[in-house]
Amino acid sequence: MMKLKSAAVAAAALVASAGVAGAEKMEVTHWWTSGGEAAAVSVFADAVNAAGHEWVDGAIAGGGNARPIILSRIAGGDPMAATQLNTGRDAEDLVQAGLMTDLADLAEAEGWADFIRPSKLLDSCTYEGRIYCVPVNIHSFQWMWLNRDVYAQSGVDVPSNWDEFAAAAPALRDAGFTPLAVGGESWQISGMSGVFQVALGGLDLYRAINVDKSAEAAASPEMTRVFQAIADARGMVDDGYVGRAWNDATAMVITGKAGAQIMGDWAQGEFGVAGQTAGVEYDCLPGLGVYPVLDTGGDAFYFPKPNKNVEAMTAAQLEMASLLVSKQVQVDFNLAKGSLPIRGDIDLEAANGCMKKGLEILANPENVLPSSEQTFSGDTQGQMEDLWVSFFNDPSISVEDAQARYVEIIASAD
């Protein structure tokens, strides 16, 4: 307890030393625009406003659209006070260019390394020993969400793994349902493909490709199975998937138009806003019911160096960073978002069944994988995303040709 009090005092002193922390208008950019996301981001906004500042919302719909806009503004000398990005290498070039506020002294004063878990999250924010972002949650794409009533109406049991799901798909078609709700945005198809890689290829394959960058693993029979599953999934979607937003695909499951969706745990916030309960209206399968694992992606906030009112804005940035990792804000935000907290020292009594599954998985380090955003450069990620999207959208591309291109990408990956 004495250590915690000392850390709090040190952190307060650090914020004060950065400048006079008056009421600042803080423009915050992010891409949280769905119903569940809006409920979650309001937790952060309320905390910033309660601290005496003014949260100026800069929402930009769609992460794929938002990232280049955000990064371009910062690089072009038009910084916002704070911005959401993913944990990983999104802002690597801007950090190296010295355009981000250094949070290392605050992190040390508050003891972030003592309570942020897994430690790799903080590593993703670290460059040359200094910390430039604050992780706010743990998100993983490794989930499937299923509508229980759709399966009941189709006369089949709710699947417990991918093979059962694939076997039940014809029954759902015959009953008038779409077996798999998919959104056609590139990041959705790429993320879904990564889920197949873990669930059907196995943990060793995932690590060999995403960590060791092994072209041999990319050419393996296990990876062939992954490409075949993606090809099979083409036949489980509806004709209207192209261009569909992720939350619209989630709504298909919520409203009983589709049996399931492969999507990250942020989808859980949409079920919550709709008043649905895990284990009652919907079920969840981490790792497609095959490998219950999580990849440690998620969201982080960066604080671009201000170019006016520097001392006061820097103080406000440090105060906001401290708020984002505070215990109550972490609890309230992650319960609304459907994500897991980055703090290992809080009690989520109100967590639902799916969130508890995630917490149990997270408790075993062997079940925690780095996300591809943490291991591959933006260029390599872009090449892989282009391949996944082209393969899913174009049935004329064979499994063999797609895998051959994938091997080339991994062989030259950085």
Protein language model features and the residues they cover:
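Extracytoplasmic/periplasmic solute-binding protein
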Residues: 128, 132-136, 142, 166-215
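Conserved N-terminal structural module of periplasmic/extracytoplasmic solute-binding proteins
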Residues: 21-97, 109-111, 158, 315, ...
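Hinge/lid segment of periplasmic solute-binding proteins
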Residues: 88-141, 192, 283
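Long, aromatic- and glycine/proline-rich binding clefts that accommodate carbohydrate-like moieties
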Residues: 117-120, 282-285, 334-386, 390
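Glycine-centered hinge/linker elements that transmit conformational signals in sensory
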Residues: 169, 211-243
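Short, solvent-exposed loop/beta-turn-alpha elements that line the ligand-binding surface or hinge
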Residues: 104-117, 184, 200-225, 273-278, ...
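Extracytoplasmic/periplasmic substrate-recognition and gating elements
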Residues: 24, 46, 50-51, 76, ...
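Conserved C-terminal helix/tail region of periplasmic/extracytoplasmic solute-binding proteins
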Residues: 25, 47-50, 75, 152, ...
